[in-house]
Regions:
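Conserved donor-binding/catalytic core segment of Leloir-type glycosyltransferases
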Residues: 103-121, 127-130, 143
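Short His-centered aromatic/hydrophobic patch
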Residues: 12-17
Length: 199
């Protein structure tokens, strides 16, 4: 396809998409931390570097991802950072807002985190703090929206700490419902241990 058409360049959203493409056309690759985070010298790391060090530009979604890429061996001069964009705020559907209000009835204060369930996102610290917070705020709730490798560990921790009434997990929900949860919450919690400006 590339050979037979007037393609000026290729933009890929994953390094694997470029791994087998043999062309002298300009190539740009988008990166996220999860997909490039392989120990230096491993076969996966070598494959990543073979692709990323042979493209025109590497677009990292954050400074954290850029620094991780450099640490993994990607040439710094090739990397630019473009943070993910956001959609304009839209008016929320009353039906979704009512559904969330029914789910959270009598729960207050309401904390929420929307992110992958990764170790570095640090959900467990919030969950552990709830053990003490529920003594002061018996109706407190922590809403976790997302999915990831740590999901089962977090659910196990919730059970061990007897916090099933205080922690709610949601995944594969619509944007409308997710935004309604955010709208009906009091505090958006970002407890990451990596990003310096976590709240």
């Amino acid at each position: 396809f590339i050979k037979n058409n007037k393609i000026e360049g290729v933009i890929a959203d994953h390094w694997k998409s470029l791994e087998l493409i043999k062309t002298n056309k300009k190539k740009v690759c988008l990166i996220h931390s999860k997909e490039i985070n392989h120990n230096k010298g491993t076969s996966l790391n070598k494959r990543v570097l073979n692709v990323l060090n042979n493209v025109e530009k590497v677009v990292a979604n954050s400074k954290f991802t850029k620094n991780l890429a450099i640490k993994c061996g990607v040439e710094e001069s090739k990397i630019i950072v473009i943070n993910p964009g956001v959609d304009p705020v839209q008016k929320l559907d009353k039906k979704s807002l009512n559904k969330v209000e029914d789910l959270l009835k009598h729960k207050s204060p309401r904390l929420i985190t929307v992110s992958r369930f990764d170790k570095r996102k640090n959900h467990e610290k919030v969950i552990m703090s709830l053990r003490n917070l529920k003594q002061i705020y018996p109706n407190i709730v922590y809403i976790c929206v997302g999915y990831g490798d740590e999901e089962e560990n977090l659910k196990k921790l919730v059970e061990e700490l007897n916090l099933k009434e205080q922690v709610m997990f949601f995944k594969n929900i619509s944007n409308e419902l997710k935004n309604s949860f955010i709208s009906k919450s009091n505090i958006f919690v970002m407890p990451s241990i990596i990003y310096k400006k976590s709240v």
